[in-house]
UniProtKB/Swiss-Prot annotation:
Family named by the database record: Belongs to the aspartate/ornithine carbamoyltransferase superfamily. ATCase family.
Any one GO BP annotation for this protein: amino acid metabolic process
Protein name as annotated: Aspartate carbamoyltransferase catalytic subunit
Subunit structure: Heterododecamer (2C3:3R2) of six catalytic PyrB chains organized as two trimers (C3), and six regulatory PyrI chains organized as three dimers (R2).
Gene that this polypeptide is encoded by: pyrB
Keyword vocabulary terms for this entry: Pyrimidine biosynthesis, Transferase
Amino acid sequence: MVFFPHRHLIGIKGLTETDITYLLDKADEAVKISRQREKKTSTLRGLTQINLFFEASTRTQSSFELAGKRLGADVMNMSVGNSSVKKGETLIDTAMTLNAMHPDVLVVRHASAGAAALLSQKVACAVINAGDGQHEHPTQALLDALTIRRAKGKLSRIIVAICGDVLHSRVARSNILLLNAMGARVRVVAPATLLPSGIADMSVEVFHDMKEGLKDADVVMMLRLQRERMAGSFVPSIREYFHFYGLDAEKLKAAKEDALVMHPGPMNRGVEIASDVADGPQSVIESQVEMGVAVRMAVMESLLISDNNGPRSEGVGA
C-alpha cells in the first residue's frame, strides 16, 4: 500500500484534502530534520534526481537541489543554456534523452503551460512540476499552506487575500485551488487589467480596492508584478501601481493585527511591497523559504518511497 496515491505532482488540481494534509504532515517532519545539526538522511540513497529548468530560478531550483541532497539523492542540475535545447532540440527529444539515463525523478520548470504534464507521459520516472507558464506551481502553494498552518494552526475558515498580478501568476492559481480545497476563504485583490477572465468562477471574492480586500484578513499574500510576462500596458506606471496596490504599513492596518504577510519571491521592493512591511514583524517571507525545502523533501519522498521504505514501482498512481 502506498500512502500517497500519485506518481507525479503536476498540479494542485486533482489532489484531495487528504492528499494535501498528508504532504503537509510529512513536510512538518522534514522541518525537524532540516533544523538538526545532521541534516542528511539516506531516504533516497541510490536514487537520481534531475533538475531541468528552462526558466531562470534561484529559490526554487536551489530549494529542490537542497531537498534532494538532504534526502541522500544524487542530484544533477541540467543547464539549459548549455544544452541541446539551445541547438533546436524539442522538449520531447530532451525528455527521451533524459529518460534513457534512467533517473528516478525529474523536476521541471518551463515557460509553457502543460510542459510538465507532457513530460510525465514521455518518461518512466516521477515528474514534479516546478512551474509551467501561467498554469501551476504546486510546491509553492504547498509551502505557503505549510507556513500558514504552522503559524495559524489551521487552514480552514481563515481569510486569505491574494494581491497583485493574479493574471500572470501560477502561484495564485495553485494557492486558490489548495486553499479552497482546505476550506479557507479566498479573496483576490487587483486592478481589472491584472485579473484573468473567469476569476469569479474559481470560488474567490474579487476586490479592486486594497483596504476593502484586506479587511479582517488573516493572511496577506502579495504577488510579484511579472513584467517579463507582460506584452502590453497592464499598469499605468510602477509608481501608480504601488500607490494603489503596493502593500505598505497603512494598507496593512486593514487586515487583522496578527495577519501574516507573505510573498513567493523574488520581491520587487517599492513595487508590490514596502521594505518596512517585508522586513516587519508580521512578515513570514523567510519562513516560506525554509518551508520550501521541507515541502520538496516531503513531495519527493512521497512520490518515490513506499510505506515499507522501499522504492516505489513504476507506473503507480497518476
